[in-house]
Amino acid sequence: MHRSIDKKKIYFYLILLTVLLSIHNQNFNYSIYNFFKIKKIELSDNIEEKLNSQIYEKLNRFYNFNIFFLKSEEVENILDNFNILGDYKVKKEYPSSLKIDLSKTNIIAYYFSNDQKIYIGENGKKITQFDINYKNLPSIEGKINIKKLFNLKMKLKKHGFELNDFIKFYLNKSNRWDLLYNDNLLIRLPLNDIESSIVILKDIIKSNDINNINIIDLRIKNKIILS
């Protein structure tokens, strides 16, 4: 994730802090120390209030931390626990504020596990704790393997397909994919050389009236079965 810090300001305040702490006046030093305690945490306002509140609750522990001694990784470790987040940028604003820009990940598919609907984010994480209002999301059935899904997604996208062009993805026990396209067209991909089959699939869809086709079987090398 991204971090953004004004280095010139850091150096200035570090020098200032060092000089002031060298003055042997405990009350004064205490005032200076408090001056650099975190008093404000600001989150970007492009996410819903419920999520903002949950993140604020977890970040409350950093109030009154000395801003110089707070490691950005400490904040990032908390944000990483929110699977709905796709990206964030933590910025220290001296002397006493944190500003965090947040953005949610795109949802690309969903599946069911023990009757619970689980979403898959573009960030590769499983998302369950938030209400999702995405439309036209494809479902995943059979074996659930996010790594294989993203590998297939990359190959489809390379040849002009998006995941939501399809209704359903089914990963067989053999790790071979079946795809449901336009509600009624079943595409059987081979176990190997998937990308070549996707090229063939693209050509078939472009050059044929697929309304009368129910199955495109590409499992056998150098053979296309339409039925």
Positions of predicted regions on the chain:
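Charged, solvent-exposed interaction patches on well-folded alpha/beta domains
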Residues: M1-S227
